């Protein structure tokens, strides 16, 4: 979809309600609960990715990409939702994908999607966008947080070491919130598919740290 910019007068002094009202009355697009965003450069062009946690079919959520063509125009694409194929089955991921909340980007430009599900059921998905066109070909479950009551948030990759990631764990039933450092000994190859092997290594480390993996 092609998009254009709406200029809101005195936006820097407007309250949240006024900004939303101004967008809607100006024929702007209303997304349901946008939560997080990442920006990366592809072929010299900046692309913005954001998670709309409760948008889409039955409020399940979706992730969008916006190619920033110029100061006044952009191209909006549906990056991932429940209709995106699951990597290991080649069928739509369906109800397994629910309420994408946070995003993360690794040193190779790959996008990770962190869910906001009830504690103990939240997944982190690796988005396979092999050609970097802003539309994920498939999703692979990268990690699952099975700790009772807990929610993963704030996934972050070390900018100086692609083998290291950090994940915040909050709302645990044990009341023991923490930040976990995950590291592997696999040296990533310069292709997106190699991240699957790296991801499997991280899942194993994550499971050992926080408990049994969900199957």
Regions from the PLM with identified roles:
Residues 188-208:
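A short, hydrophobic C-terminal helix/tail in secreted or cell-surface proteins
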Residues 211-215:
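Short, charged juxtamembrane terminal tails flanking transmembrane helices
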């Amino acid at each position: 979809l092609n998009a254009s910019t709406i200029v809101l007068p005195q936006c820097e002094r407007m309250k949240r309600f006024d900004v939303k009202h101004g967008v809607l009355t100006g024929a702007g697009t209303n997304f349901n609960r946008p939560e997080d965003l990442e920006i990366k450069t592809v072929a010299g062009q900046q692309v913005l990715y954001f998670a709309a946690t409760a948008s889409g079919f039955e409020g399940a959520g979706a992730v969008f990409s916006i190619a920033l063509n110029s100061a006044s125009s952009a191209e909006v694409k549906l990056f991932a939702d429940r209709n995106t194929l699951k990597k290991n089955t080649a069928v739509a991921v369906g109800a397994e994908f629910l309420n994408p909340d946070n995003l993360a980007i690794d040193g190779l430009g790959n996008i990770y999607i962190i869910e906001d599900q009830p504690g103990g059921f939240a997944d982190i998905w690796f988005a396979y966008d092999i050609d970097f066109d802003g539309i994920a070909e498939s999703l692979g479950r990268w990690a699952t947080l099975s700790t009772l009551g807990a929610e993963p948030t704030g996934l972050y990759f070390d900018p100086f070491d692609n083998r290291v990631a950090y994940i915040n764990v909050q709302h645990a039933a044990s009341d023991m919130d923490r930040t976990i450092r995950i590291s592997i000994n696999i040296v990533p190859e310069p292709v997106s598919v190699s991240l699957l092997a790296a991801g499997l290594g991280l899942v194993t480390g994550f499971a050992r740290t926080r408990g049994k993996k969900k199957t």
